[in-house]
Amino acid sequence: MNLSTFIKKARRWFYDTPDRALEQAYRAALNIQAIELEHFGGKPVSGHNADYSDSVIRYFQGEVRKQLKIIEVRLREFRSFNTVVPVSEETIQKKASNIYYPDAADKPTLIIEKLRFIDEITGRYGRGLSKQSVALVPLNGPEAPQTNGDRPDNKPKVETVSDKTGLVPRSIMRTFSRIQREIDPKSNEAEAEVVTKFRRSRNKTAVSIRFLLTLVIVPLLVHQLAKIAITPFVEEHFFTEASPALFVNSDLENEAFEELEHYRATLEMRQLVGLAPALTEVEITEKIQEKATEIAQDYRAESYNAYENIFSDIFSFFAFVGILLISKREIAMLKGFLDEIVYGLSDSAKAFLIILFTDIFVGYHSPHGWEIILENVAKHFGIAESRDFNFLFIATFPVILDTVLKYWIFRYLNRISPSAVATYRNMNE
């Protein structure tokens, strides 16, 4: 970037400061309106206008305070810069860029509309943006309803643009304006923006699903290929013909002994009840020897599998980590895709999924599931099962998981979707 380009961008940023400050204040007012419409029926944020707990009301009040502070700072910035930025220079800089800006004739109308909307929102929480406004005391509560014109003021009453009320509500006019922009045949920019957003969303969905499949398929494929390649190595170094080792742990050995004893008892039982012809001691010994050889081969193969699983899982883990290291862009897109799915669910769906997750992993019947998981993991790696370790794990890990989940609900979900938390508590009770 050369010096002239840098100077042009700096000048453009300076001349755009009033519009940028007003836009940020306008968006903060829109955020306050969204909270009022979604959670308080379009009324000011107050405990009188909703059936939320004190903690939820305090959360919403804190959010409104933050937005009011943004409005206060940005409007001060707008007033300061709007008096010093030359209009001619501002117009020149905007025309020099490729960014769309409203015509000079339309700009005052847009500014007045935004200031009117900001006055309408902030007027509900005190005079202008004074300390009383930040204290968040709604003026139109149920006990003493007031409007902008009812506020006590020692100064002469001056009618502002926001105090004027037309015959038609402004929200209806804004709706008609939006519809007009959407059906306007000249609004190619809006149509192009919609198409661009759709293509971006479609691309993000395709990349996310493809990345998820890669995370699952590639490690599994590496596991199977590694197991095939490792089998000769395991047979050569761990289980030779001269090696007396048949079992990798005592559990497999006990299972083999129980199976052999069961075969011996079955053989004797069939002879005693007449289901099989009587056999001599030599014949019985030969049959038991054949069964013992068969059992030894089966458990030797199971021991093979345990060693192969250890090495194959190591290769699969490295493959999984390698995919994550080289796919930072895909990870970011997957995170956004999952956020859209999770936070796009209704409050009841969120509460249902949370209750389902907690009941499965930390609920009353979860110890039985954890015990089965630990048994299969130990069998997968050829490790002797330890009842003491299983009980210790079941007594600690679900508790830690439950604590983490409750902290997540309190710290994050309560801030992002407090209504989902309220629904979760009602469903859980």
Curated annotation (Swiss-Prot):
GO MF term set: proton transmembrane transporter activity
Alphabetized UniProt keyword annotations: Cell inner membrane, Cell membrane, Hydrogen ion transport, Ion transport, Membrane, Transmembrane, Transmembrane helix, Transport
InterPro entries for the chain: CemA (IPR004282)
Record family assignment: Belongs to the CemA family.
Biased composition (Basic and acidic residues): 150-161
Protein name stated in the entry: Proton extrusion protein PxcA
Record GO cellular component, one term: plasma membrane
Annotated compartments: Cell inner membrane
HAMAP family named among the record's database cross-references: CemA_PxcA (MF_01308)
NCBIfam families reported in the protein's UniProt record: PRK02507.1-1
Principal subcellular localisation of the protein: membrane
Transmembrane segments: 211-231, 306-326, 353-373, 389-409
Pfam family name, one: CemA
Disordered as annotated region, ranges: 139-161
Topology of this chain in the membrane: Multi-pass membrane protein
Functional summary from the UniProt entry: Required for H(+) efflux immediately after light irradiation to form a rapid H(+) concentration gradient across the thylakoid membranes. Together with PxcL, contributes to transient H(+) uptake following dark to light transition.
